[in-house]
Each structure stands twice: as C-alpha cells, then as structure tokens.
C-alpha cells in the first residue's frame, strides 16, 4: 500500500510539473567534486574520451563540463590549436573549470576556449549547422530528452564528426536508491518534487538513442566502479559531496532533509548488518558515435552538404 501511495504522490507531482532542479546541489558540491567524484570516476571519463579521435585544429563542444576534468584533457589533446565551447548550468562548477582552463591556455594563442553558464538544450540549439568536429556529453545526458538532444548534436556535427557520451546507469548505487525509495514509500509527503532523469538501463539503450537520432554507433560498453565508502555515513557523504545525489535538496520537503538522510542511513545500516559489507557500485555506460557522411550523388552531382547548402 505504501508504494501505491508513493506512486500516487509522484503522479500528482508530475501533473503539477514539480521537478527538482539539480543546479543548487552541483553548486554545493563544486568545491568537493574534485576530491570525491573525479578521483573515483575521472579515470573512466578520460578513458572514454580516448575512444574518440581529437586532432589539433578540431572544434569541440562539451555539454555539462562540470569542474573541467574532461575540458582539460580535451585542451591537452588539441596540442595548442583548436577551439572548445564548454557549458555547464552550475556557476559553481564552472568557476572551478575556468581556473583549470586559464592555467592550460595562457600564452597559447592558437587555442580558443570559452566557457558559458547555460542549459545544454538551449546551447546546442544555438549552435550553427555542421560547426563541430566533436561533441562530448559527460554524466549529464540523463537530464535531457536524450533522443532530442542527440538529434540536435547530429545537426551541429559536421559529416563524419564524432560524439562521446558517458553516463550513469539506472542500477547505480542500487542499495542507496532502494533505501531512499523505502523512506519515501513510508512517508510520501517527504517528496515535494521529482528528480527528472533518464538514466539508461545499459549501453545498448544509449546506442538505441543514437540510432533514433540518426547517428552511427562506433563503440559501446558498460562499466562499474565500487565507490570508496563502506559505512552508511561514508556512503551518504560521498553521494552528497560528489554530486551523485544532485537534485536531492529540492526534491525533499524543506526542513526535513536531515530526517530523510537519517532514515536512509538506518536502512543502509540494516543492509550492512545483514550482508556484512556495503559495496556500492557506480555503474555507467560509454557510447561513441559519428554523424554519417552524406553519400556521393550519382553522375557527378554534389549533395547539399557537399555544396555547403544548409
């Protein structure tokens, strides 16, 4: 019965368009992100970026750049020549990224790197057709309507241009999310807005999004990383200070956030006592792709894209 009440509560919130905005949580996590998230998951991000070619002179767009972990790696691989347009909705995260970028671009006039506080969907819609060689989306496509965003990315990519997406999987932090669901099921009034995310089941699901958007998949894989937190208190600290729980503050009744955290911690303590360990996994997917090159027209005619016609 409690889960039915929770479902009814969620439906009412959805009908009223009560959606949690994760920006405040990312702002709060910005000073700790490179202490908690980047050392654990940053290596997976860098490995994913290595799966797409980047050459000096490339034009790169990075959506949701966060604290600039991948932005810095992109700049290094451009080797002194090229452009980067990186955006994030969180001013706090972008401030950290900007400091990294300034250190890497000083005295290198061949690099044109600009950072903007902006929404992913709005920014990509503002970009010209066929204006990017590579688009990178790290840990953030879940906050959009993925197929629609990917279709816009396809428009912005030049023919043959590449895309890399790394994203958290739907089964990540399973013990934690199950504990949170139980807390909300026991008292649905604690939930005041919905955290709207489209986390994929697996890499095949993201590959399906690519296909629907007209992009060719060049690689796909699933991965997992055990987070370095093995007590209930440490788990809760990691997910809050790493940004993994972004949206929590605005999703929970103001003034009862600590109550929710205490109840989740108790649920994790029960799991630890029952199982003997807390191995919380951050599962993720990596999918790379490309915009198909337009086939050559017969009899020597040029296609619209080859002729430069939008």
Describe these PLM feature segments.
Residues 125-135:
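A short acidic, Gly/Pro-enriched loop at the edge of an enzyme's catalytic core
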Residues 59-125:
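Class I SAM-dependent methyltransferase SAM/SAH-binding core
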Residues 2-56, 69-73, 93-96, 100-103:
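Conserved class I S-adenosyl-L-methionine
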Residues 2-18, 67-69, 198-310:
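Conserved Class I S-adenosyl-L-methionine
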Residues 80-81, 157-162:
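Short glycine-dipeptide loop
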Residues 134-147:
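A short SAM/SAH-binding and catalytic strip from SAM-dependent methyltransferases
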Residues 49, 72-75, 150-154, 181:
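A structural alpha-helix within SAM-dependent methyltransferase catalytic domains
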Residues 148, 154, 162-230, 246:
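Conserved catalytic/acceptor-binding region of the Class I
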């Amino acid at each position: 019965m409690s889960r039915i009440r929770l479902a009814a509560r969620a439906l009412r919130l959805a009908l009223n368009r009560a959606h949690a905005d994760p920006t405040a949580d990312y702002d709060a996590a910005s000073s700790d992100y490179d202490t908690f998230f980047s050392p654990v998951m940053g290596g997976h991000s860098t490995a994913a970026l290595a799966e797409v070619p980047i050459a000096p002179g490339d034009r790169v767009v990075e959506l949701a750049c966060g604290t600039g972990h991948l932005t810095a790696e992109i700049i290094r691989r451009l080797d002194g020549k090229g452009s980067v347009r990186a955006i994030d909705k969180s001013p706090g995260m972008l401030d950290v990224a900007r400091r990294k970028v300034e250190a890497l671009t000083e005295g290198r006039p061949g690099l044109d790197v600009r950072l903007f506080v902006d929404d992913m969907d709005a920014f990509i819609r503002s970009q010209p057709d066929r204006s990017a060689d590579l688009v990178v989306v790290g840990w953030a496509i879940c906050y959009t309507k993925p197929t629609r965003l990917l279709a816009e990315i396809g428009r912005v990519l030049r023919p043959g241009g590449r895309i890399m997406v790394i994203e958290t999987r739907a089964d990540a932090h399973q013990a934690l999310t199950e504990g949170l669901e139980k807390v909300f099921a026991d008292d649905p009034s604690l939930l005041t807005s919905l955290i709207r995310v489209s986390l994929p089941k697996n890499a095949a699901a993201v590959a399906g999004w690519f296909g629907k958007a007209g992009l060719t998949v060049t690689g796909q894989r699933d991965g997992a990383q055990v987070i370095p937190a093995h007590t209930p208190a440490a788990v809760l600290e990691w997910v809050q200070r790493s940004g993994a729980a972004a949206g929590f503050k605005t999703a929970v009744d103001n003034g009862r956030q600590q109550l929710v955290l205490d109840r989740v911690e108790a649920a994790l303590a029960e799991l630890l006592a029952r199982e003997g360990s807390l191995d919380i996994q951050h599962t993720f997917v990596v999918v790379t792709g490309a915009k198909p090159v337009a086939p050559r027209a017969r009899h020597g005619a040029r296609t619209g894209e080859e002729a430069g016609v939008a």
